[in-house]
């Protein structure tokens, strides 16, 4: 067994066993993960303990991560339109090449800070970090690396350490933190058999000790850190899991989402290459999620019963429609196959259509990547 971590895309791009062996040799050595140790609540920094400040009744300041993502394109306009919100502080903003990503940060209420989720203080200076700890009223954490195949060790800095930094910022004034997680933190049989009664905490379902299924493992760790920060520091925590629908998708809802794929194909002039992919995706209209999140953010700043709650608060958003890879491929081929659009790998295609305003957000997916002979290579649930 090789106790190393490697970007899977690097391994799959190796054409020979010699090249694969070289990638293994170059991989970073990793240890078995002690999940209890890795998800301990951060302590409150001494530099922030002395800066506690009572908040007034003026317009709210909302801190947002993941502000150039697909969901943020729906959330930021909702927050800007709310008269109770005076300022939206977008942190850990990394430069993106396309204009659509930058344009959503140009609202009158938006202040942006360049940075990186993987950096200490999210790339903010000590003074900026302390200032926001006193200014911010509520935090919405949507930022994460969403690599489909990478190990937890590769995603840890961006997806887990960033949450600890937000706890540091929130703790002095007990600023509510709203965290976008995934239903993948629960085993499929637990989620599927619960009929709406899935456990609110995923604490009992630790991820693999080797860090495999890294994205889901990082979300599980994030939930646990926030749960424990609530217990030890009193930081209000709100966790959101987008999950598969429990009802059959209507023909109308499937038609709407398939037509949305067609619209995005026309805008990008590329088609998805689904070779080797099987499975399905569960989707929710982005506007619906954004409006519900906006209401929850405002509501959490007014709550007086947070200290009486026994645990972090969980909210589930059920998807409204499920479509299979075959559904997507067949529909697009029938309506746009004759136009000669260039095919691109399906994951890259999803990124392209998000960039041009795909109006749904991914609630969950179950996918299998097979080789050319139909043999199973990789299975993913998130």
Residue ranges and their predicted role:
Residues 138-141, 149-150, 157, 161-214, ...:
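Conserved Rossmann-fold NAD(P)-dependent oxidoreductase catalytic core, especially the SDR/UDP-sugar
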Residues 191-197, 227-282, 286-297:
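NAD(P)-dependent short-chain dehydrogenase/reductase
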Residues 55-84:
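N-terminal Rossmann NAD(P)H-binding glycine-rich loop of SDR-like oxidoreductase domains
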Residues 161-165, 221-222, 285:
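Conserved cofactor-binding/catalytic machinery of classical short-chain dehydrogenase/reductase
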């Amino acid at each position: 067994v090789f106790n190393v971590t490697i970007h899977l895309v690097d391994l799959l791009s190796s054409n020979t066993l010699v090249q694969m062996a070289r990638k293994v040799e170059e991989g970073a050595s990793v240890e078995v993960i002690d999940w209890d140790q890795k998800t301990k609540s951060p302590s409150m920094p001494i530099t922030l303990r002395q800066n506690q400040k009572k908040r007034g009744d003026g317009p709210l300041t909302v801190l947002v991560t993941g502000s150039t993502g697909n969901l943020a394109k729906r959330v930021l306009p909702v927050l800007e339109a709310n008269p109770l919100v005076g300022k939206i502080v977008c942190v850990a903003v990394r430069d993106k090449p396309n204009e659509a990503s930058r344009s959503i940060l140009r609202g009158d209420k938006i202040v942006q800070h360049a940075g990186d989720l993987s950096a200490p203080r999210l790339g903010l200076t000590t003074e900026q970090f302390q200032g926001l700890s006193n200014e911010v009223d509520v935090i919405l954490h949507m930022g994460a690396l969403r690599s489909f195949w990478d190990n937890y060790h590769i995603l840890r800095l961006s997806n887990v350490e960033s949450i600890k930094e937000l706890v540091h910022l929130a703790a002095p004034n007990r600023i509510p933190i709203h965290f976008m997680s995934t239903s993948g933190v629960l085993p499929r049989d637990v989620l599927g058999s619960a009929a709406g009664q899935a456990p609110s905490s995923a604490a009992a379902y630790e991820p693999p000790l080797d860090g495999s299924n890294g994205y889901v493992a990082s979300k599980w760790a994030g939930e646990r850190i926030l749960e424990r920060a609530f217990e030890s520091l009193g930081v209000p925590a709100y966790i959101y899991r987008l999950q598969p629908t429990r009802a059959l998708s209507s023909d109308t809802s499937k038609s709407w989402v398939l037509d949305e794929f067609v619209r995005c194909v026309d805008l990008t002039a590329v088609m998805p290459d689904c070779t080797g992919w099987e499975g399905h995706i569960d989707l929710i209209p982005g506007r619906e999620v954004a409006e519900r999140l906006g209401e929850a953010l405002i509501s959490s700043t007014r709550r007086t019963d947070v200290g009486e709650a026994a645990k972090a608060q969980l909210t589930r958003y059920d998807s409204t429609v499920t479509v299979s890879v075959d559904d997507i491929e067949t529909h697009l081929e029938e309506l746009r196959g004759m136009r000669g659009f260039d095919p691109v790998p399906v994951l890259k295609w999803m990124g392209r259509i998000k960039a041009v305003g795909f109006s749904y957000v991914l609630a969950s997916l179950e996918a299998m990547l097979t080789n050319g002979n139909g043999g199973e290579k990789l299975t993913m649930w998130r």
